Every structure is written in structure tokens, then in C-alpha cells.
Amino acid sequence: MPICVLRKSPKRRSPSPKRRRSPKRRSPRRSPRRSPRRSPPRRRSPRRSTRRSPRRR
């Protein structure tokens, strides 16, 4: 029985890398959920750009 489990473990490890790539593609989709926390830093970036524009003028 344990031998069968050991044989199945390597087989499950092979698809694991492929499954790890999928979460990376879903990460952008999860970022919108964290956007509320990242929104403050993102709002500061546009404010800096607007402050630079009048200074250049």
C-alpha cells in the first residue's frame, strides 16, 4: 500500500508546477480585491504627476 502512495506522489508533483502557474494568472484577478488597500498608494502616484505638470509649466 505505501508503495502505491509513493508512486502516486511523484505523479501528483508533476502537475503541481502546472497548477502553480495557474494561480499566478489568477493573481491579477485577486489584486482587484486588494485594490482597496493598494488604492491609497495608487492615488498618491497620480497626485505627484499632477504636481509635476504645473511645475513643468
UniProtKB/Swiss-Prot annotation:
Domain of life: Viruses
Span list, region Disordered: 1-57
Start-end of Basic residues biased regions: 8-57
Name listed for the protein in its UniProt record: Uncharacterized protein 106L
Record organism: Invertebrate iridescent virus 6
